[in-house]
Amino acid sequence: MNPKSPLFLRLSDRLDVYLRLMRADKPIGTLLLLWPTYWALWLASDGIPDLAVLAAFTIGTFLMRSAGCVINDFADRDFDGAVERTKNRPFAQGRVKKKEALLLTAFLCLLAALCLIPLNHLTWLMSLPALFLALTYPFTKRFFPIPQLYLGLAFSFGIPMAFAAVAGNVLPQAWILFAANVLWTLAYDTVYAMADKEDDLKIGIKTSAVTFGRYDIAAVMLCHGGFTLLMAVLGAVIGAAWAYWTAIPIVLLLQYRQYAAIKSRVRQICFETFLANNRIGWVWFTAIFAHTFFAK
């Protein structure tokens, strides 16, 4: 195909728009979804996850995160133009139609559903509330005072699904990990919301940063503390090897550094602090990986 032909240029433009809607150039959301899923897969499989299951969850996570981003932009299409961070998104620039976004969301969900084929029926069943949470979260910002808590539920459903896929049932430690991840998500997404707080107050969007008001930093650190405490409880429940426990002082240091950073409440610093949570996910994955290795 001639790269200068009208058809090629049209297809290239549509592909660019769709990839931007999917946040394909911003993998942080996929990583923050993958870390707790990987924690669960490694714990449930004693450190040796089946490659087909691992691939299914990895690809499925990317696809569902992408679908969530598209439906999020659809839901926020009337607000994104008024927010500094989102004013250049496709809807805000008038580069995409509502029908296109809905069809792209449906297509991505269909592809994600195909990833369930090699998994058991319990995993299929648990994917239904996961799908519901992922697709409805963006609309909670209109009426729910802490939508980040709802997002925490959506971002944590990979955990019981992973246990269901590997063990055939959801063990108690899965729910401890689930609760821990809800708190972690609430912490880092509140920091994310702090970056947009002034804009959200003007347009009337509800976020945890708005709801917590001047106690937003205290709320973030309480959630971080609860997350780390529950990870310690998880370690006790599974009889974690010594390597697991080395994560706690490292994570506490990373959390303190986040506290020191967000005290300024500067928009860019809050956004960079949100991104830094990828390190916490990586540290805990390394600790769980080491636990499964040394516990054998």
UniProtKB/Swiss-Prot annotation:
EC assignment: 2.5.1.39
Gene Ontology cellular component terms for the protein in this record: plasma membrane
Recorded catalytic activity of this chain's protein: all-trans-octaprenyl diphosphate + 4-hydroxybenzoate = 4-hydroxy-3-(all-trans-octaprenyl)benzoate + diphosphate
InterPro entries linked to this entry: HB_polyprenyltransferase-like (IPR006370), Prenyltransferase (IPR039653), UbiA_prenyltransferase (IPR000537), UbiA_prenylTrfase_CS (IPR030470), UbiA_sf (IPR044878)
Localization terms from the record: Cell inner membrane
Pfam families linked to this entry: UbiA (PF01040)
Cofactor entry: Mg(2+)
Membrane topology: Multi-pass membrane protein
GO molecular function, one term: 4-hydroxybenzoate polyprenyltransferase activity
Membrane-spanning intervals of the chain: 28-48, 51-71, 102-122, 124-144, 151-171, 174-194, 212-232, 233-253, 274-294
Keywords recorded for this protein, A-Z: Cell inner membrane, Cell membrane, Magnesium, Membrane, Transferase, Transmembrane, Transmembrane helix, Ubiquinone biosynthesis
Family annotation (Gene3D superfamilies): UbiA prenyltransferase
Gene Ontology biological process terms in this record: ubiquinone biosynthetic process
Pathway: Cofactor biosynthesis; ubiquinone biosynthesis
Keyword Amino-acid biosynthesis annotated: no
Family: Belongs to the UbiA prenyltransferase family.
Functional note: Catalyzes the prenylation of para-hydroxybenzoate (PHB) with an all-trans polyprenyl group. Mediates the second step in the final reaction sequence of ubiquinone-8 (UQ-8) biosynthesis, which is the condensation of the polyisoprenoid side chain with PHB, generating the first membrane-bound Q intermediate 3-octaprenyl-4-hydroxybenzoate.
Protein name: 4-hydroxybenzoate octaprenyltransferase
Originating gene: ubiA
